[in-house]
Amino acid sequence: YGFNKPEWQQYLIYIGGMLHGDFGTSFQYSNQPVSSLIGARLGASMQLGLQALILGVVLGVIVGAIAAVKQGTWVDSTATVISIIGKSVPNFVLAVLLQYYIGLKLGLFPLAGWGQFSQTIMPTIALAVGPFAETARFIRTSMVDTLSSDYIELGKAKGLSRMEVIRKHAMRNSMIPLVTLIGPYAVALMTGSMVIEN
């Protein structure tokens, strides 16, 4: 372990090992390599992260688009409040609430375990709330800006229906900047899923 060397050398040895995939050995799990322990659990984290990313982004796009189209109505206000609450509540708090009410009180889904799809539903929902809230707010803002653009007015002047203008022009152009958010979402979900999994 190099404990007899100066601290700066120990640090450099450790960082050098990490660059080569050697994270050391676990003291808790009978001296097993840490990299093998991470590898054994990475599949579950990736599955939860991917499910949460898909669910959060898809629902966020739908809710954000509806809020933008219904701008200034109770639908817009409700979507905004839900997005703010979704961003404000930590996912581990939501996970505990889901376990208590949906898992324990209602008995709809298993409280713990791994191996069946039903066991991933509550953790996926808990993880998806953050990306959902951000995506809904982002899409709403982007679509409101897009709907007030000149080319939207031109589409209406050409005789396109409101739904055609929204689908062909507003949605398409509002989705492009969303791609920049997916990378940070994926990283946040991979790190956040560790808390939810426990």
What is the predicted function of each stretch?
Residues 2-3, 16, 20, 103, ...:
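Residues at helix-coil transition
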Residues 38-75, 91, 114-198:
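Alpha-helical transmembrane segments of integral membrane proteins
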Residues 20, 94-95, 144:
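Alpha-helical transmembrane segments and their lipid-water interface positions
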Residues 22, 89, 105-106, 146, ...:
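A general structural signal marking secondary-structure boundaries and capping sites
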Residues 1-12, 27-28, 32, 103-122:
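Hydrophobic alpha-helical transmembrane segments of membrane transport/permease proteins
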Residues 1-6, 57, 66, 74-86:
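N-terminal signal-anchor/first transmembrane alpha helix
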Residues 14-16, 81-110, 126-130:
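Membrane-water interface segments at the C-terminal ends of transmembrane alpha-helices
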Residues 3-61:
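An internal, D/E-rich "acidic patch" concept
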